[in-house]
From Swiss-Prot:
Signal peptide: none
UniProt source species: Helicobacter pylori (strain HPAG1)
Annotated catalysed reactions: carboxy-S-adenosyl-L-methionine + 5-hydroxyuridine(34) in tRNA = 5-carboxymethoxyuridine(34) in tRNA + S-adenosyl-L-homocysteine + H(+)
Function as written in the Swiss-Prot or TrEMBL entry: Catalyzes carboxymethyl transfer from carboxy-S-adenosyl-L-methionine (Cx-SAM) to 5-hydroxyuridine (ho5U) to form 5-carboxymethoxyuridine (cmo5U) at position 34 in tRNAs.
Underlying gene: cmoB
Gene Ontology BP terms: tRNA wobble uridine modification
NCBIfam families per record: PRK15068.1 (NF011650), tRNA 5-methoxyuridine(34)/uridine 5-oxyacetic acid(34) synthase CmoB (TIGR00452)
Family membership: Belongs to the class I-like SAM-binding methyltransferase superfamily. CmoB family.
Subunit architecture: Homotetramer.
Upper taxonomic lineage: Bacteria, Pseudomonadati, Campylobacterota, Epsilonproteobacteria, Campylobacterales
Keyword tRNA processing set for record: yes
Record key words, sorted: Transferase, tRNA processing
Name the record gives this protein: tRNA U34 carboxymethyltransferase
Cited Pfam families: Methyltransf_9
Residues annotated as binding carboxy-S-adenosyl-L-methionine: K25, W39, K44, G63, V114, E115, Y135, R250
Length: 261
């Protein structure tokens, strides 16, 4: 949990926090008020925080949401940090949080998507984190290309995406929704994802972890509006989504932009 002990009027603070719902990423604690977010993002952070060194590196978080991972990255001493997310509400959440967790104003927050990277930030970053974005893209290869071109030579990409459990080079293309999400287009097998990444130009594809999403990591709280993971799964068989697909399985990966291609 990210904690700040600044003394603030608790009633006013809580009103501001609740006005910014839903809180997807967190948790945070400000002046003893805990923002109990839908996702316990510390679980994902613990899986990727040691994937590569961030000290003195130029680092990006693509799909940064309210900045939870950016604030955690600050603890590792990067040279600079840039977050990218086109969402309006999540930027407002970041602007609310930053005075507590980025007091030196080291983080740059860009209201841009992955598709804007290669034009605005070509060959710019030593490390890019892209967590939970790829399956929302209608063209995952184009998204991977954008990430590739935004990296410096020998730069590293740390990627998290939904995957399917299959040895084949295939991807699931949900008909209408996946776990009630309308904006999920391609969920690859690990083998298919590796092929996509290699076609774009990445090398040294490494599996960091593969984990099922559980209610410990994603669940309904007072700080979100609406439903969460358990509402998206089959009531009688939690190994399946409501649509009958396999329940969410996530893969965490690291790869390198080589010096020559």
């Amino acid at each position: 949990m990210l904690t700040c002990n600044d003394k603030i009027n608790p009633k006013t603070l809580l009103e501001e926090i609740m006005a910014l719902r839903p809180w997807r990423k967190g948790p945070f604690e400000i002046s003893q008020i805990k923002i109990d977010s839908e996702w316990d993002s510390s679980i994902k952070w613990d899986l990727v925080k040691n994937a590569t060194l961030l000290k003195d590196k130029v680092v990006a978080d693509v799909g940064c949401n309210n900045g939870y991972y950016l604030f955690k990255m600050l603890e590792h001493g990067p040279k600079s940090l840039v977050g990218f997310d086109p969402g309006v509400l999540v930027k407002k959440q970041f602007e609310f949080l930053a005075p507590f967790f980025d007091k030196e104003k080291k983080i740059i927050y860009e209201s841009l998507g992955v598709e804007d990277l290669h034009e605005k930030y070509p060959n710019a970053f030593d490390v890019i984190f892209c967590l939970g974005v790829l399956y929302h893209r209608k063209s995952p290869l184009e998204a991977l290309k954008a990430l590739y071109h935004a990296l410096k030579i020998k730069g590293e990409l740390v990627l998290d995406t939904l995957i399917i459990d299959s040895p084949l080079d295939i991807a699931l293309c949900p008909k209408k929704t996946y776990a009630k999400m309308k904006n999920v287009y391609f969920i690859p097998s690990v083998s298919a994802l590796k092929g996509w990444c290699e076609r774009v130009g990445f090398e040294n594809f490494e599996i960091l972890s593969v984990l099922k999403t559980t209610p410990k990591e994603q669940r309904k709280t007072d700080f979100i509006l609406g439903q969460s993971l358990e509402d998206f799964l089959d009531e009688t068989d939690h190994s399946k989504t409501l649509e009958g697909y396999d329940a969410p399985l996530r893969g965490y990966f690291k790869m390198l932009k080589p010096s020559k291609r």
